[in-house]
C-alpha cells in the first residue's frame, strides 16, 4: 500500500497503490525449450487440497524444491529473504518517487518534501529548501509540493508552483513516476539477460512427484519423491503441463478407496503400481502428494548485442502483457479474483518465497512489481496518479478551467480514504494468512 501522506493540499499529492500481485501472470502451456512467456514466480494450481503445485524448478535453488506453500497462505521464511524482498519493494518506491521529483525539479517546479515511507519520521535533512525524510513504515512514499501550504511564504501566484504550471508540465510530473517504473522494469530485465540469462524450459512426458506426505496413501503404496507418473488408469500423460496434473488429480478424486493404476518412471526403470486413495472429509479421494509438470529449466544467454536487446524486449513485452491481462481478468471476474488482491505484506511474503527458492527470480519479481505499480497507478481512480491525470485532462477539456478546489479536494479525499481502508484491510488479511500467525491463532 503506497500512500501519499504529505501535508501539502490533497489536490497536489501523488499517492500510489499496489494491488493484484498474488497472481500477476497468466498461465501459458509449457513449450519445449522455449523462453518462458511469464514470470518465474510459481503459480499455484487449483488443486491445493491435494498439495499439487504448478511450479518451476531451478538448479540454483536455495532450499529443496519440495518445500510446500498452501494456496491463500504466506510464509516469510528466513530473515534474509524477507530483507531482500523488502529491499526490492523499497527500491521500486524510491524509483517511482524519484521520477516525480526529477520531473518537477528539472522543470523548475518547487518541491517541498521527498519521503520514503509513511508515519513517524526516523531521519531527515534539508537541502535546497527540500525536506528529505525516511519514515517508520517503508511501504510507500510521496513527493510534497508547497502549493496552498498555509505555512509557506511563497506567493500563491508564483509561476513555479505546480498548480500554476501549464497542463503539459503537470502531466509530465504526475506521469513521471509511472514512466520511471516502466524504464526500471526494462533495465532490470536487461540486467538479467546480460548477467544470468533468461530461463528456458524443456518439457518431458508425465507428471513429476516432488514430495510424498508421510503416512499417506501414496507413501503406503510405494510412491516416492522424484517419481514421474507416465500414465493413470491407462491414460498416457504425454504432454507436461497443468492439464496432465489435472488428469491425475481428477482420477484420484473420483476413486476414493478404489485402486488407481499408475505407470511410474523411477530413474531408468518403468513399472506399474496400484494406489488406493484415502477418502477425504468431502468424500473425494486423496493420496497425499505434491505434483508438478515434468519440466526442467536451464538458462540461455545472448551471443551478441542485438540478441541482448531482442531477448530483453521479448521478455519485457511478455511480462507487460501478462500484467495487463491479469488486471483485465481481475475486473472481468472480480467476484472470483477479489481474494487474490494483495497488499504489501503479501507482496513481501511472495518476494521472500521467490528469494528463498531462486535468487535469479528476484529479477522478474522486481520487474513485475514495477509493471504492476505502473499499471495500477495509471488507473483513473482518485488517490492514484491516474486519478490526478484525469482531473488535469478534465481541466483541459473545460478549456483550462479547473474544478472548484472544494470539489477537487472532496474527490481526492474520498479516494484517499477508500485506499486507506483497503490498504489496512489487505494488511490485516495478509498478516492473518502468514503461516506463523495461523499457528498462533
Curated annotation (Swiss-Prot):
GO biological-process terms attached to the record: proteolysis; response to cold
UniProt cross-references to InterPro entries, sorted A to Z: PDZ, PDZ_6, PDZ_sf, Pept_M50_Zn, Peptidase_M50
Transit peptide limits: 1-84
This enzyme's EC code(s): 3.4.24.-
Domain PDZ: 196-249
Coiled coil: none
GO MF entries: metal ion binding; metalloendopeptidase activity
Membrane topology per record: Multi-pass membrane protein
Entry's localization field: Plastid, Chloroplast inner membrane
Keyword Aminoacyl-tRNA synthetase tagged: no
Annotated GO CC locations: chloroplast; chloroplast inner membrane
Cofactor dependence: Zn(2+)
Positions bound to Zn(2+): 96, 100
Residues at the active site: 97
Membrane-crossing segments per the record: 171-191, 373-393, 407-427
Knockout consequences: No visible phenotype.
Annotated keywords: Chloroplast, Hydrolase, Membrane, Metal-binding, Metalloprotease, Plastid, Plastid inner membrane, Protease, Transit peptide, Transmembrane, Transmembrane helix, Zinc
Function: Metalloprotease essential for chloroplast and plant development. May be involved in regulated intramembrane proteolysis (RIP).
Similarity comment: family membership: Belongs to the peptidase M50A family.
Protein name as annotated: Probable membrane metalloprotease ARASP2, chloroplastic
Lineage of producing organism: Eukaryota, Viridiplantae, Streptophyta, Embryophyta, Tracheophyta
The encoding gene: ARASP2
